[in-house]
């Protein structure tokens, strides 16, 4: 099985910073760099994907101590979108790579970003599918955030403090007092927020996070602090549409607690009401937690300590996306034996193994890099030290609701 390296589409917005370039190794000709779309088949920011020529790992990829070395890389260096082929075109030619769960969608359902908010983003809301399809001819947007870094005192806005009428909200916008209606949430690295369509929200200044979202770029901007772009123009607001789609009810205490979490749990323990994946662990110092799930994505967060080893299954049901949040490691993917016939003509599967007869790929991975494993029967493993985000599709819809 070939491992695909994703080269992100880079977005330059007025609120962006330099951390994605300086700390996460994202290559971009423009600064400030606000967003890196590290898994995207969207027309507004199509990532690119490249594969190794021989699906082999260079000699000397691991030292005698078992730690990863950059000598084992077989991809082109750099993360510019000039590398590889269009991810959207790749999926068009290989629709099976998404997996059987993806057949429910007319498009690749998931989009993943790294976001560096040096300045605050606008306060905004996203419509659901029903409204977006009827009014915009495109899909809505549900998303989740995983906070990676924050400056001292950094916060975000997330839902309303109490129930408000449309008139009260409209008046607050006109009087430039809209932020006072919202829940102001102080953040710490590791916090997770699940944001259903219709929830008013905004990333505050000094926050760097990963965003996993529905494959949509539809945003209704409600409030932008009166600021202007490089040409001296204020950015367009979408107040009327926003008022139609926003959930004006109070964000309940239950919901705030459920959507803001920290910590890590050993594999096998329950996390956020769902059991961990149940995949096998060969060594200690491995932690896995389910941090979010809906029909468009399921997300697990994996912690490896002291060069630990983790192994999981690959299936024909879903692709697997791996985003390195911190640290480094060696990623391996293998396919199973092919089906063979018994000499007497009856079909028979050989015992499932992962020997040299199957295709095997291996590569060194590090902070800020994104990888795509196509849907196929097999297994994958990761050995190293760090934090990793695993995204895939699952059959069960686990969106939390009040």
Short names for language-model regions:
Residues 52-82, 260-285, 334-362:
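Intrinsically disordered, low-complexity terminal tails and inter-domain linkers enriched
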Residues 256-263, 281-328:
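Basic, glycine-rich polyanion-binding accessory segments appended to enzymes
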Residues 1-164, 224-264, 268, 299, ...:
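Transition-metal
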Residues 322, 333, 364-367, 371-375, ...:
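Active-site pocket scaffolds in enzymes
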Residues 107, 115-120, 139, 150-153, ...:
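Ligand-binding loop in jelly-roll beta-barrel domains
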